[in-house]
Amino acid sequence: MLCVIYRSSKRDQTYLYVEKKDDFSRVPEDLLKSFGTPQLAMVLSLEGREKLASADIEKVKEALKEEGFYLQVPPPLENLLKQHLSDDKK
């Protein structure tokens, strides 16, 4: 299974995985608007892979099969002040 990965032009560290190059027919229009102009990042074979760098490969495969796309968003930012204050209370 091949997938094509696009980088968002509007959102840092946000990627859209689709099955075919430049085929966004199954991606909701509102998502594409907020994603911005997709910038090709890479074409990747999922066959024989056990993991991906920043996404669960099984979730990616399932989403591609069921929905036709997978959206990878960055992890939430740590609130370092909150963490620091919490550590001080211990």
Curated annotation (Swiss-Prot):
Record organism: Serratia proteamaculans (strain 568)
PANTHER family per the UniProt record, alphabetical: PROTEIN YCGL (PTHR38109:SF1)
SUPFAM superfamilies: YcgL-like
Start and end residues of each YcgL domain: 1-85
PROSITE patterns per the UniProt record, alphabetical: YCGL
Name the record gives this protein: YcgL domain-containing protein Spro_2755
InterPro entries: YcgL-like_sf, YcgL_dom
